[in-house]
Amino acid sequence: MSRLVVLLLVLLIAVPLQAQDLVLHAGRLLAIPGETDATNQTVVVQNGRITSVMDGFVSASDAGLPDAKVVNLREHTVMPGFMDMHTHLTGERDPERNPHAWTTKMDGDVLLESLPYLERTLMAGFTTVRNTGANHEIILPLKRGVEAGHIVGPRIVAAAGGITPTGGHGELHGYREDILHAVNNSVGVCDGADDCRRAARALIKRGADWIKITATGGVLSNTAAGLGQQLMDDELVAIVEAAASMGRKVAAHAHQAEGINAALRAGVASIEHGSYADDESVQLFQETGAYLVPTLYAGVHLLEEMEVNDNIPPPILAKINEVIPNVKASFQRSLAGGVNIAFGTDCGVCPHGKNAREFELMVEYGMEPIAAIRSATVMTARLLDRTHDLGTIQAGKIADIVAVAGDPTADITVLKSVDFVMKDGMVYKAPE
């Protein structure tokens, strides 16, 4: 389907919502999770931004906005909108679905199928996501549709494809060569430092906000090529340098320690998964300031899928059994070592809209509840270089705000039931 037709479909989806002046009465406000915790607070929102935070429940008139709507969240814990740093919004694993169905679909079909995934993600309280791998002809129109207000969904920071070596985790596997040549989009496939520079520049030309690379093998690629380092050291450095020269940062999918450490030495901003992070990895994280995006939920979900899905290809099944038992220990090692941790789920592998399950696993594996909340707000804003706009509830910030009944610092599972969602000052979900 042509880009013009896809764009027309997007424009017909919905009428843009309009931001309005609002006065929020928060029973408890975690304005800067991990730093501030206050009760009986008023948050004033105008033109999509937070204009003030005041003690007490201030009336609309006393806030200087007599016509503003007052939102009663006096029985709720109010927090900044959550951010998920590892999503795949254009698909979702389903054991009941034909795994080859994508070969019959046009880009427009996939775009339309993605709309519920975006809406479910936003309604779960995730107002910003970093999409770490999708066809640029689909994810970029989705991003623009959200920005224009035509699509209900989270703010999208898009990788717009990925970089992988020939035969690497990011390539298609298990199909005839003539089929692969017909459907494979090879702009991100590179071999050698010069070719990998080209790949990074090509993705940026397409519109990538970030560069996603597969530094190691991966679990869900249908090939018995292992989980070790696949992009070589000089290729990693070339990608990071090329991306930096055009103002982009690099996120590296990496499982085995050698690939994690090589990517960190090359200067990537984040490691995705980090399943075998070792002591050297922790030291490199500390030295570089890079972030771990742990994606704990994806692994747990794959183990659950194994119980009901008898059709997982043997190479994938073997890697699931190899990797997942190591994830908890690796996360705990990174946590104990003071590694920067940014929230990320790998939703698409796991169900969209269930992102908050990651919070539960982070706490189950040893993270304090407030630190888990901070990982999805303050820390994610830092990773995205968006602390001027996102991550906290402060005057001048974009009004991305969520609320839950109950105390998430005592029971993290309440984050799985978000009652209130605001993005860009627009209310998408509110208590009955």
Where are these regions (language model features)?
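Histidine-rich, glycine-flanked metal-binding segment
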Residues: 29, 33-79
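Metal-associated gating/positioning segment near the N- to mid-region
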Residues: 76-150, 166-170, 234, 258, ...
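Divalent metal-dependent hydrolysis catalytic cores, especially in the metallo-beta-lactamase
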Residues: 113-139, 152-162, 208-221, 249, ...
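Bacterial N-terminal signal peptides
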Residues: 5-16
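Active-site gating loops and adjacent loop-to-helix segments of metal-dependent hydrolytic enzymes
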Residues: 90-110, 166-185, 219-232, 288-324
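His/Asp/Glu-enriched, well-ordered alpha-helical/loop segment
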Residues: 102, 245, 249, 314-315, ...
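Histidine/acidic-residue-rich catalytic or RNA/ligand-binding cores of hydrolases
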Residues: 93-97, 139, 169, 221-223, ...
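Histidine/acidic residue-rich metal-binding segments in metalloenzymes
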Residues: 141, 195-292, 322-341, 388
